Amino acid sequence: MPDQSSMRALRPGAGRLLAGALLLTATLASPLALAALKPGDKAPEFSAPASLGGQVSTFSLAAALKKGPVVLYFYPAAFTSGCTIEAHLFAEAVDRYKALGATVIGVSGDDIETLNKFSVSECRSKFAVAADVDKKIMKAYDAQFMKVTGYASRTSYVITPDHAILYEYTDMNPEKHVQNTMQALEQWAARQKR
């Protein structure tokens, strides 16, 4: 059994190890560590298979931006509790987004067959959800959960017609994504009228 002096010698090293582990955990868990694209950054172009009301088409960011701003939201997986809540919230708000000229698109790593069902039952056929099975869109937008999993982080972007990121919000709680993106979009629309 070690004596008290050798125990004291072990504690400082153990303390530094513990502090380092806590710092790493806090950094990885921080919402700020999840999304790197910031306001003013150019939004990466993408096209992907998407489902709206169970009907598959190709969603093109460039084509959507020709019509107005885009609210792009990433979510971890269809039919999970938080993602279902978020889909319902976006579906309830989609008419307000459309009144501001905006298109809403959700993106996850789910396959298109799953999204066909999700787009009808949870998105209520109000907006499209795109399949990013190869995770290229998530990577381009730095929206991978913890950067190592196959799931998207819960990250929302507002992108203006000039392909610029206007607003970014990352939080695994789905409750504020609609409220915050709507507020950013309304402020942008008000500035456009001046």
Give the location of each predicted region.
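Thiol-/selenol-based redox modules, centered on thioredoxin-like
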Residues: 152-194
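Bacterial N-terminal signal peptides that target proteins for export
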Residues: 2-21
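Structural microenvironment flanking redox-active thiols in thiol-disulfide oxidoreductases
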Residues: 84-123, 135-138
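Boundary of Sec targeting at the N-terminus
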Residues: 34-36, 41
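A short beta-strand-turn-helix
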Residues: 47-69
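Short active-site neighborhood of thiol/selenol oxidoreductases, capturing the structured segment around
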Residues: 61-84, 88
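Short loop/turn microsegments at loop-to-beta-strand junctions
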Residues: 44, 69, 153-155
